[in-house]
Curated annotation (Swiss-Prot):
It catalyses: tRNA(Leu) + L-leucine + ATP = L-leucyl-tRNA(Leu) + AMP + diphosphate. The keyword Ligase applies. Its main location: cytoplasm. It comes from Nitratidesulfovibrio vulgaris (strain ATCC 29579 / DSM 644 / CCUG 34227 / NCIMB 8303 / VKM B-1760 / Hildenborough) (Desulfovibrio vulgaris). This is Leucine--tRNA ligase. Disulfide bonds: none annotated. GO terms for molecular function: aminoacyl-tRNA deacylase activity; ATP binding; leucine-tRNA ligase activity.
Amino acid sequence: MKYDHQSIETRWQKKWEDSGIFQCDTEADKPKYYVLEMFPYPSGNIHMGHVRNYSIGDVVARFKRMQGFNVLHPMGWDAFGLPAENAAIKNGTHPAKWTFANIDNMRSQLKRLGYSYDWQREVATCTPEYYRWEQLFFLRFLEKGLVYRKKAAQNWCPKCHTVLANEQVIEGLCWRCDSAVEQKELTQWFLRITDYAEELLADLSKLENGWPERVLSMQRNWIGKSTGAEIRFALDGRDDSITVFTTRPDTIFGATFMSIAPEHPLVEELIDGKPQADDVRAFVERIRNMDRIDRQSDTLEKEGVFTGAYCVNPFTGRKMPIWVANFVLAEYGTGAVMAVPAHDQRDFEFARKYDLPMQVVIQPQGEALDPATMSAAWTEAGALVNSGAFDGLANEDAKQRIADDLETTGNGRRTINYRLRDWNISRQRYWGAPIPVIYCDACGVVPEKEENLPVVLPLDVKTHDDGRSPLPHTPAFYECTCPVCGGKARRETDTMDTFVESSWYFARYTDATNDKAPFTPDALRYWLPVDQYIGGVEHAILHLLYSRFFTKALRDCGFIELDEPFANLLTQGMVLMDGSKMSKSKGNVVDPTEMIARYGADTVRLFCLFAAPPERDFDWSESGIEGSYRFVGRVWRLVEELREHLLAVGACSSTAEDAKTPVARELRLKEHATVRKAGDDLNDRFQFNTAIAAVMELVNALYLAKDELVADESGRKVLSSAVSTVLTLLSPFTPHLSEELWALLGHTESVSTLPWPRWKEDALVRDTVTLVVQVNGKLRGKLDIPADASREEVETLALNEPNVLRYLEGVTVRKVVVIPGKLVNVVVS
């Protein structure tokens, strides 16, 4: 009988769906395991990256079920956002119609791969049933002071017609469309993620045993904690001051000028009435539209313009010119930097370019730095010089002494600064969750009443070809009544950043059909945190950081009782073609649907899991998938050939008594060694490729042993046990193949419900071992001896082995070297 993967796979997929075998409920008396892959944007078709990601998750889910866990393995759709809106506009259709058609198609594709999802828990973030709870969270955050509105310069994508969070700007370009990002003054809604900066940083230590260090490091760097001091510099000729943040208060005596950001609020005041005002304004306008990341680059050419204003160094009394510089950012620290060119490389380059003074205040041991001959700033440790009463102090000690002085005199204070900035969630696009806020001329900004949720995104709108939102031009949406005074009012027409939806979806899965609440405390307590989260490392900062923040904010609003959403994280590698990322523009895309039609879902899954460890990239290869296809066929033919013999003995687990011959004993040993190896590789290490390799070796052993073992009943029992083990071990990887062959062997229960096999210690002990016998290091014979033979018995048997005896004639045996379990070397002369 030919292996017809198409009919076999679709038949088993229907059986699984009809039986609800993968549905789960909260069972307080059973250990839980929550495995989750990052849900996809419904683009219309899955790609090979999806296949790899979801195949990894499915193996984990199936393996954990076999270990006795109550497994939650859900799937849904990250369905709002720019891609869907832009694609719908391009194709002349409505984003909702486009999105739901894509969801239907991708759901069918995922089902065709045989993933063991609980489809009852499916969510789509673009439905009112989902985003009503997100709007509730917004109102509770607003009530708690975690949401605020302000006007500020924002990252603006002219092509997408919306603002971008700092994390969504990659090297000055929009993360979605690669357009150059501009700066635009807008009033926006923000979430106070900075309120959680320290906790987000500190709690990374809780994840050290479960998350990749690379991701932890990326989050630490993005949060960017700096310990230092704020110092006030009086403005010359004015009753005002300008404050800087510095991590190097020990260098205060070397500050010779000040650099401020083009966006600094004092720029206009400082240049008012100055002859260079127009030059400064032109410089500010040019630099403000530069990418913030580029402005921090070490290779950036340092540029600036003198404001004509001065400040006064509080320690030296020296007047310091104030410059606007391109490398100073308004959002870092205070937007002003005390420039110490002798001890900061950026300041050094700037001072050299504009001929500004330098003052050495830290000398390395045994050297005397001279500003006139320095080729770079001295940024290492040393002793203070030219620093008044602090001369001679080690610079680390001086940091504390000078900070003490600042706090005593009132000129400054110790402080901590973070690179992290509050999360701008306002988007000027249509396809997103409406922000539940109303503007009333009489009452101001008014939150929508909770009982009026959801604020439904209207579907009866006409989208604009250029991407502008239709909501500000849809009176039926924005015209409303003020919840406070009952007067005429206007709804907010911005929608929420789609990363808001993905920041809490993992919690909704625990109670996805609840229409009275986003989730219940019992469901959350039982299922959370997610035991194993799986997704790409590209989400390290955006999605993963936002989800961690959202969990803590929901906790503080009384919704959740935990601190971290994901206990363990696996970041899978990419599927490449000829070393490059697959993309339509490169013409190197492999279509999963085509591969499934040609080879079957099991083969596609198997290849994606066998090609490389899950965290590493791998190259797609025709020879590789052909090899996986041959293996699937090999297993099919093995069981088909042995079927009648195996049906005769029935299902059994062979015993030591059944393994009467060396071949039987070796196969039984191989079976149990494979169970141990595969279990170790899957149990939290997730080394799928080596687990599969071990099963392949067992299949090879079966082929070598089958002809001898079918001859008697005890041998057939050993065969039956080993074949059953192969099908059980393969079931997480190739579930359709395993189900079909299991049924062909007369079993009525699903292989998916079987427990993971257990290996027996006694089966791993060999009764005999094979030793190589050498004479003067050259192979002359082999010995099969009892495993517990003594050294003396081994020597005697080796010296009397017939082939060896021929090489001992006429020579003198000087020494016999025995390496237990491996070889005997007879030294002669």
